[in-house]
Amino acid sequence: MRLRLRLLALLLLLLAPPARAPKPSAQDVSLGVDWLTRYGYLPPPHPAQAQLQSPEKLRDAIKVMQRFAGLPETGRMDPGTVATMRKPRCSLPDVLGVAGLVRRRRRYALSGSVWKKRTLTWRVRSFPQSSQLSQETVRVLMSYALMAWGMESGLTFHEVDSPQGQEPDILIDFARAFHQDSYPFDGLGGTLAHAFFPGEHPISGDTHFDDEETWTFGSKDGEGTDLFAVAVHEFGHALGLGHSSAPNSIMRPFYQGPVGDPDKYRLSQDDRDGLQQLYGKAPQTPYDKPTRKPLAPPPQPPASPTHSPSFPIPDRCEGNFDAIANIRGETFFFKGPWFWRLQPSGQLVSPRPARLHRFWEGLPAQVRVVQAAYARHRDGRILLFSGPQFWVFQDRQLEGGARPLTELGLPPGEEVDAVFSWPQNGKTYLVRGRQYWRYDEAAARPDPGYPRDLSLWEGAPPSPDDVTVSNAGDTYFFKGAHYWRFPKNSIKTEPDAPQPMGPNWLDCPAPSSGPRAPRPPKATPVSETCDCQCELNQAAGRWPAPIPLLLLPLLVGGVASR
C-alpha cells in the first residue's frame, strides 16, 4: 500500500500539466497507473521495480499509450487521455510494452505464436442470455468474422457441432465477470471481449465476449455494441495478432463502432500485412463464403409515452440541438428524445439517432428534452440537465434521483443553456442566456463573484445551444446550425467564426451560399473593468491591448481565479 501511495504521489508531481492547466486528480492518476499496468505499458508495481521507475519511463509509458490511441503525445494525464482510458476496449494488453513500441515502425503487432495447421475448427458453446440476436444470427456473424481473415490468408475455418472427444480450435463463449480465466469482465462498458493466442494449451484460440454488453448487429439507432466488429477484432488475436495503432486497423484496442455489411467487409492493409506475415497470402482460388446471411433482428416499434404523441425523427442537418457534449471522447448531439454519437475519428456511429430513454437507463419518462450534458472530470460521472434539475449517471445507469441546480450555485428555479468543464482550470461553467456561473468540482462549491457576463468570451453567441471541449482542448460554442471555435487556452474566437456545423460535424452537405450567421458583438468592458481584464488574461494569456510583461505578475496570479 505504501508503495502504491508513493507511486501515485510521484505521478502527481511528475506528470501534472503545466501550471496553467488543471492538475490531474488522484482518482485520474490511480486510473492511469492501473490502466497502464493492466495493458502492458508499465510493469506490475513491486519494491524491486518501483525503485528503478524514473520520471522519463513514466512519461514514456503515457506517450506510447497516447501514440497508440492517436492522441497528442503530452506525456501527461490530460483530459483526452483520461477519456480514452475510460472507453470500451479489448481485455488483452497491448502486448509489446513501452520499449518495443518506442522502437517499432510498423503498426501491426505479432504475438509470436501461430497455428501450425491451416484448417481450424470453431464452435459457439454459449450464447448471449439477453440479446436481440438469435443464436443463428450469432453463429452466422462468427462465420463471417472468421471469413474476413480467411479471405486474406491460407486459412480455412469449419464450424463443428458438439464435441466428440476433442474441443474445436476456437471455442466461443459469452460469459460474465469471473469465468475461469485471468481476464474477468466488468459489466456494461469497459472491457468487451478477449481471445487467447494460438498454442498447445486447451484455452489457446478461445474467444470470450462479455455477456453483460448489449450486443447488436445492424442497429439503426447506434445503440449497443456491434458483435461483428468486435468478433473480427478478437479473432485477429486468436490467430496471433496483437493490437495495432494504425488508424483504420480492426486491431486497434478501442471499440470503434460498426464496420458495415459483413459480406462486403475487408481488412485494412495493416491487418492484411500482419496476418500474411504469419500465414502467407491467400491462394488464387476463390474463398468459400458462408451460404447463410446474417440477419439483423426485426425492427421493434418505438415505445411511445402513455399520454403524449410519438416524436418524429428529426433531421440532424438542421442543427438547433438541445445539448451537445463530449462524453468520454465521443460527441453526443441531443435533440428531443433522440441523440446522435460522433466517434473520435469524426464518423457518426449511425446516421439515425438513438432513443434517449433506451440508452440512458433510469432517466424519468417525463424528461423529453436534455438541455445540457457533460462528463464530470473528477470521477467520470455523466450529468444530464433538464429544467431546474439534473441527473447523475455512472456509464448508462442512473445514480439516485433528480437533483436541483441550486447544488451547483444557481438561483432557485433557474435553468441552463450549456454546461462544460474547461480543462485550462478544471472548473465547470454553467451558461444561461448572457451570463454564466462557475463551479469548483474539487471543492464541491460554487465560486464566488458569479454570474458574469458571457461577453467575456469574446465572440461567443448569447444563449448558446451548448458548449463543449474537444479531445484536443479547443472550446466550441454551438447555436442554431453554426459553431464558434475557441483555440486551446483562449477565450477569443477564431476570426473566421462562425462556421456551419453540418458538413464539419455531422456528415451533412455544405450549405448553399447565402448570408452568414450574424456575428456576436465584440466584447466590451463591464462596469468593473479590472475584473473583465482579469477574465481575459487568466483564461487565454491574451490582452485587449499590449501590456508590459513586467506588470503581468502584479495583475494576474494564474488561471485559478478565472
UniProtKB/Swiss-Prot annotation:
Requisite cofactors: Zn(2+); Ca(2+)
Disulfide links within the chain: C317-C508
Pro residues compositional bias, start-end: 295-304
Annotated lipid attachment (GPI-anchor amidated alanine): A539
GO molecular function: metalloendopeptidase activity; zinc ion binding
Cofactor note: Binds 1 zinc ion per subunit.
Region of interest (Disordered), residue spans: 278-313, 490-526
Hemopexin repeats: 314-363, 367-412, 413-461, 462-508
EC top class named in words: hydrolase
Keyword Hydrolase set for record: yes
Gene Ontology terms: cellular component: extracellular matrix; extracellular space; membrane; plasma membrane; side of membrane; specific granule membrane
Binding residue positions for Zn(2+): C90, H233, H237, H243
Annotated GO biological process: collagen catabolic process; extracellular matrix organization; hard palate development; inflammatory response; proteolysis
Tissues where the protein occurs: Expressed predominantly in leukocytes, lung and spleen. Expressed also in colon carcinoma, astrocytoma and glioblastomas.
Name this protein carries in UniProt: Matrix metalloproteinase-25
Name of the encoding gene: MMP25
